[in-house]
Design a protein with these regions (language model features):
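Short secondary-structure boundary micro-motifs
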Residues: 17-21, 41-42, 48
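A short, exposed loop/beta-hairpin motif centered on an aromatic-Gly-Thr core
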Residues: 31-42
Length: 80
Protein backbone atom coordinates (compact mmCIF):
# COMPACT_ATOMS: atom_id res chain seq x y z
CA UNK A 1 0.00 0.00 0.00
CA UNK A 2 2.78 2.45 0.91
CA UNK A 3 4.71 1.76 -2.30
CA UNK A 4 1.57 2.23 -4.39
CA UNK A 5 0.84 5.52 -2.62
CA UNK A 6 4.38 6.82 -3.22
CA UNK A 7 4.31 5.80 -6.88
CA UNK A 8 0.92 7.44 -7.40
CA UNK A 9 2.06 10.66 -5.73
CA UNK A 10 5.27 10.73 -7.77
CA UNK A 11 3.23 10.43 -10.97
CA UNK A 12 1.61 13.74 -9.98
CA UNK A 13 4.96 15.49 -9.53
CA UNK A 14 5.60 18.57 -11.62
CA UNK A 15 9.07 19.74 -12.61
CA UNK A 16 10.48 22.93 -14.05
CA UNK A 17 13.88 24.31 -14.93
CA UNK A 18 14.83 27.38 -12.92
CA UNK A 19 16.84 30.39 -14.10
CA UNK A 20 20.03 28.87 -12.65
CA UNK A 21 19.43 25.74 -14.81
CA UNK A 22 18.59 23.54 -11.82
CA UNK A 23 15.46 21.42 -11.63
CA UNK A 24 12.66 22.11 -9.18
CA UNK A 25 10.01 19.52 -8.44
CA UNK A 26 6.92 19.53 -6.27
CA UNK A 27 3.75 17.53 -5.73
CA UNK A 28 0.52 19.50 -5.55
CA UNK A 29 -1.48 19.00 -2.31
CA UNK A 30 1.64 17.79 -0.47
CA UNK A 31 2.60 20.97 1.38
CA UNK A 32 6.35 21.21 1.92
CA UNK A 33 7.24 18.37 -0.44
CA UNK A 34 9.65 19.81 -2.98
CA UNK A 35 13.19 19.34 -4.26
CA UNK A 36 15.79 21.36 -6.16
CA UNK A 37 18.75 19.59 -7.79
CA UNK A 38 21.21 19.93 -10.66
CA UNK A 39 19.68 17.15 -12.80
CA UNK A 40 16.14 15.95 -13.37
CA UNK A 41 17.00 12.46 -12.14
CA UNK A 42 18.55 13.82 -8.94
CA UNK A 43 15.51 16.02 -8.46
CA UNK A 44 13.17 13.02 -8.81
CA UNK A 45 15.20 10.98 -6.33
CA UNK A 46 15.34 13.81 -3.79
CA UNK A 47 11.63 14.52 -4.21
CA UNK A 48 10.80 10.89 -3.47
CA UNK A 49 13.01 10.91 -0.36
CA UNK A 50 11.32 14.10 0.86
CA UNK A 51 7.90 12.55 0.17
CA UNK A 52 8.80 9.42 2.13
CA UNK A 53 9.90 11.45 5.14
CA UNK A 54 6.80 13.65 4.89
CA UNK A 55 4.56 10.57 4.89
CA UNK A 56 6.29 8.95 7.86
CA UNK A 57 6.15 12.13 9.91
CA UNK A 58 2.54 12.72 8.95
CA UNK A 59 1.52 9.22 10.00
CA UNK A 60 3.40 9.51 13.27
CA UNK A 61 1.80 12.86 14.12
CA UNK A 62 -1.66 11.82 12.93
CA UNK A 63 -1.82 14.44 10.18
CA UNK A 64 -4.24 14.26 7.29
CA UNK A 65 -2.59 12.71 4.23
CA UNK A 66 -4.21 13.39 0.86
CA UNK A 67 -5.84 10.55 -1.01
CA UNK A 68 -3.96 9.66 -4.20
CA UNK A 69 -5.52 7.54 -6.95
CA UNK A 70 -7.98 6.14 -4.44
CA UNK A 71 -5.26 5.22 -1.92
CA UNK A 72 -5.59 6.53 1.64
CA UNK A 73 -2.73 6.09 4.09
CA UNK A 74 -4.52 7.60 7.06
CA UNK A 75 -6.40 4.29 7.24
CA UNK A 76 -3.12 2.60 8.18
CA UNK A 77 -3.08 4.42 11.51
CA UNK A 78 -6.72 3.57 12.16
CA UNK A 79 -5.99 -0.12 11.62
CA UNK A 80 -2.88 -0.17 13.83
Amino acid sequence: MLTSYIRAAMRQAQYKILEDNTFYGEIQNFVGVYANEDTLEDCREELQEVLEGWILLGLRLGHYLPQVDGIRLDMVKEMA
